[in-house]
Curated annotation (Swiss-Prot):
Listed transmembrane segments: 5-25, 31-51, 62-82
Domain of life the protein comes from: Bacteria
Catalytic activity reported: a quinone + NADH + 5 H(+)(in) = a quinol + NAD(+) + 4 H(+)(out)
Family annotation (Gene3D superfamilies): 1.10.287.3510
EC nos: 7.1.1.-
Family: Belongs to the complex I subunit 4L family.
Protein's UniProt name: NADH-quinone oxidoreductase subunit K
Keyword Ligase tagged: no
Keywords: Cell inner membrane, Cell membrane, Membrane, NAD, Quinone, Translocase, Transmembrane, Transmembrane helix, Transport, Ubiquinone
Organism: Bordetella pertussis (strain Tohama I / ATCC BAA-589 / NCTC 13251)
Amino acid sequence: MTLTLAHYLILGAILFAIGIFGIFLNRRNLIILLMSIELVLLAVNMNFVAFSSWFGDIAGQVFVFFILTVAAAEAAIGLAILVLLFRNLNTINVDELDRLKG
């Protein structure tokens, strides 16, 4: 059995749906929110790679590197905010972010 474009797109859609479901289901925990956003970005990246491989164009695969760079920066900033939130308020609840002033 060979994997076709449809297999990759279905897997990407499932990952995307799980990520969106995680964002809407849990809006309080910052760690789960960041993981869900990363899962959505992973699904989009997988679709880019699948389409670029299917059409024989390398532009989609190059674009994935830019998305991964932005995702790494987003994860680093998100984790820095998480550490700051936990140090100051002893919680990782997103609703408590407005209590940080400075």
